[in-house]
Amino acid sequence: MVMFAHTVYESSLIKKMEVMFMSYDKNMEPKNSTNMRKAVMIGCGFVGSATVFSLMQSGLFSELLLIDADRAKAEGESMDISHGIPFAKHMKVYAGDYDDITDAGIVIITAGANQKPDETRLDLVHKNIAVFKSIIPELTKRGFDGILIVVTNPVDILTYVAQKISGLPKHRVIGSGTVLDTARLKYELGEHLGVDSRSVHAFIIGEHGDSEIAVWSSANVSGINLEDYEEMSGEHHYDQSTKEIAEKVKNSAYEIIERKQATYYGVAMAIKRICEVIVRDEKSILPVSVMMDGEYGIEDVVLSMPSIVGKNGIEKKVPISLNDEEQEKLIESSNILKKILSDANI
């Protein structure tokens, strides 16, 4: 038998990762009365409607309830989407109000204002915090005890707000985080390398926004280090190509909005994926918005980090290895979000 000895550094790293591999109390599950085949969409704008359409096609749910401040809008979307049910699996898509959410397993919030050209980010934060303070107490009053998925931007800030005011265990309040950003990164890398994007493994972490971080140090193509794979493929400009791809991913939303005023299909697919891993209890690792509890020296702020997601929501936070530069950027990203929270008096 061949024995492998860990170096002192490796042993300390393993110990550190064991401490950081945070697991939530499995007893804190949704109540048995919760129907995980029933989902609620609060907000029927571009993102909400595209998501409901995607969920209708997925076959994940038997009931989809639409709620919007404009009841007629919710009714119109539910009617339009329902007419496609004969081409999908049988289910019920309907407009309703908060009294209908009591037994829902999943509530998705996409409601909120969009940032206007003359508005600061802090202006948007104040407006959408006000929206959340009007929505979440309605869920609490009706005893909602399922999983809350926050999509409204700035998603990391609003996930923090939702965790603070909902009364739900923090592992059952999930932000969509950088799930879409990570998909964009995988797509761009796949196009650059000429491989199926599903064979590319890499994460965007930190803020879902301008301070997001592409984790190049652990990026790989089917287990082959990304830089090595580029060399094998005849690419010899690794630093330049990764920088360009990271910028392209970060600016994707701006580029789309400039051309068609809004982004909604990609994020709809990202939300569908989050719902899928919850309903099917897949235990998949997704970079969702989670509360930091000392990992990487960061606490009391929500960041998008790889986490195991299943039927109970966020089941474990996965401490991926970061190099010094990536860890510094993650701390910078957390400080940016903390300042926004402080400026907004949260």
Predicted segments with their positions:
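A short, basic/flexible loop-to-alpha-helix module at the beginning of a structural domain
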Residues: F21-M36
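Conserved N-terminal Rossmann-fold NAD(P) cofactor-binding segment
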Residues: Y24, E63, I67-G105, E119, ...
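Glycine-rich Rossmann-fold phosphate-binding loop(s) that bind the pyrophosphate
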Residues: C44-G45
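N-terminal Rossmann-fold NAD(P) dinucleotide-binding loop
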Residues: G48-S49
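Aromatic pocket-lining residues of Rossmann-like dinucleotide-binding sites
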Residues: L55
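Rossmann-like NAD(P)-binding element
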Residues: P86-I147
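Rossmann-like NAD(P)(H) cofactor-binding subdomain of soluble oxidoreductases
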Residues: T120-K186
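C-terminal substrate-binding/catalytic lobe of Rossmann-fold NAD(P)-dependent dehydrogenases
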Residues: S166-R172, D181-I346
